[in-house]
């Protein structure tokens, strides 16, 4: 094809190094199927496969940037900093942050049993435990729609997509339907930032596709994920510094 698509996918039927050939030969078909389940009956299909593809897409500009052995320009930063987070690390982080916040305020052994990488709290000294109990009491007042999760370096949205699944379990635990929960998760719970425009677009797509797994009409509801590309900021206000704990007063 003699157009822009050739720059994106140089398709060949004979070249073994062709991207399409590598996709077909190198990635198991089940990894493209979001309905695939593992030996435990849990969802294992990879909506996140686009993250792997995007990392591959950035390989050439990344190699060029490193090969010149010069200072990395701000335009090159997205390519050289792309690193896909393995699935088990994503699960560990989400289950022991978002998941922990919920079950510490709303104890549920059945819910915890769904999280392979969840770790129970270690034994603490009495004074520490008393403070933790106060925090758990605050968690007990939380409703699912109150919780905010942000990935400030979201890449193609791998963490956000798994967080969506955990949020869905939390909502169902609280009595919500999957359809209503999917809408609320996009509107109230999940936020993401990245310096790469393309990564932000992929995250937007990945989150919507995950939502569609639970609400097949989500694309017609006019709901947009809270994911954004932010390359640089021109300033920060005193109020913003206060919000992020810089220790400033009003005077």
Task: Identify what each model region corresponds to.
Residues 69-251:
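SAM-dependent methyltransferase catalytic region
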Residues 1, 5, 14, 55-58, ...:
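Compositionally biased, intrinsically disordered low-complexity regions enriched in proline and serine
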Residues 1-51:
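Non-catalytic nucleic-acid substrate-recognition regions in nucleic-acid-modifying enzymes
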Residues 29, 33, 37, 59, ...:
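General structural signal for alpha-helix termini and helix-helix connectors
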Residues 45-63:
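Core structural elements
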Residues 20, 26, 64-67, 103:
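Non-catalytic substrate-recognition/targeting regions of SAM-dependent transferases
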